[in-house]
Amino acid sequence: MATINDNYLKLKAGYLFPEIARRVNTFAEAHPEAQIIKLGIGDVTEPLPKACIQAMTKAVAEMGDRSTFKGYGPEQGYAWLREKIAAQDFQGRGCDIDASEIFISDGSKCDSGNILDIIGNNNTIAVTDPVYPVYVDTNVMAGNTGAVNEKGEYEGLVYLPIRAENNFTAEIPTQKVDLIYLCFPNNPTGATATKEYLQTWVNYARANDAIILFDAAYEAFITDASLPHSIYEIEGAKECAIEFRSFSKNAGFTGTRCALTVVPKTLKGKAADGSDVELWKLWNRRQSTKFNGVSYIVQRGAEAVYSEEGKAQVKGLIQFYLENAKIICSQLQAAGLTVYGGVNAPYVWVQTPTGLSSWDFFDKLLQNCNVVGTPGSGFGAAGEGYFRISSFNSRENVNEAMKRITEKFKV
């Protein structure tokens, strides 16, 4: 009989969001009359920007004409999209990123896991706690951890607690680590990072020959001009960091699928023989072998994000969700709850009332208010006592959810 990858057996039972879905479905079956409002998983609700729809409609028509039909595209992505990204997202912010260092993909979630294909198995890996579960689970799958303990932590990972006391920004580890996961604006806490803070991480990474995996999926929600949108705004980052970005949350591409990963050609890792190897070459080889590229139609839609009309429409979407976050923060505070995030970020991080665990609070909101959020403990042990609420929903649903909470749930 063929053997399996035993590392999958080390995964904690049930990925966070399927477990939420299971509980919600059980409740809905028992209470079919309940009008459940979901503010849990970070999926968008508003339609795609018109500029993107028009571009994709045109691209569909091109696929119906032999003279403009497109077959397999370049695995790295079409140059016309990568060049716009390089010019507007990076060079326009003073980042020396070339279009050739950008790889178009079907999701930053995929890339943050797939990047482990080119990373060795003997690295010391640091993650924040709480943390986006994908960073941890993909390392478990890849065999980079030991077993899980009673706290839900995996042996072999270095956990960096982020709490209100440190503004939900991890402190530099006292030990040497080789791989560092950072996400700003942060999922799940909604925290942001200053240039000075990120500089300390870049300095650490360069001093310790470490690599930073920087998730910038929510950078479009930054409205404070003093905050960096990219790790490459930090001096020295091109020598130590890979950045992941997505069109999912800024342009609503969660169901359309388009993202990008930046791998600078100056970034190197160590081979077993001690030689330095360019990670760009490895990632290019990996993508060429395992990935056939994002569809032409979708890439034309992503390109439209950079048109004048597209930029204005994306800005409107961002402002819409940020206004939702503002409403959530103000209404939860009115209910007597302590909240963090929701500014320069689409997530609101709520401290649960005294005596209630994260899952207790989840059940209480579901049963009493028919509102769904995400238990903080699902993001790590340090997330216990917190709860994530997403601003990704219609204004009507956000207002109704907050009305229910303020009326039925008072601290």
Curated annotation (Swiss-Prot):
Lineage, top ranks: Bacteria, Bacillati, Cyanobacteriota, Cyanophyceae, Oscillatoriophycideae
Catalytic activity: (2S,6S)-2,6-diaminopimelate + 2-oxoglutarate = (S)-2,3,4,5-tetrahydrodipicolinate + L-glutamate + H2O + H(+)
A GO molecular-function annotation: L,L-diaminopimelate aminotransferase activity
Cofactor(s) listed in the protein's UniProt record: pyridoxal 5'-phosphate
Organism: Trichodesmium erythraeum (strain IMS101)
Protein name: LL-diaminopimelate aminotransferase
Pfam families: Aminotran_1_2
HAMAP family the record matches: DapL_aminotrans_1
UniProt EC number: 2.6.1.83
Gene transcribed to yield this protein: dapL
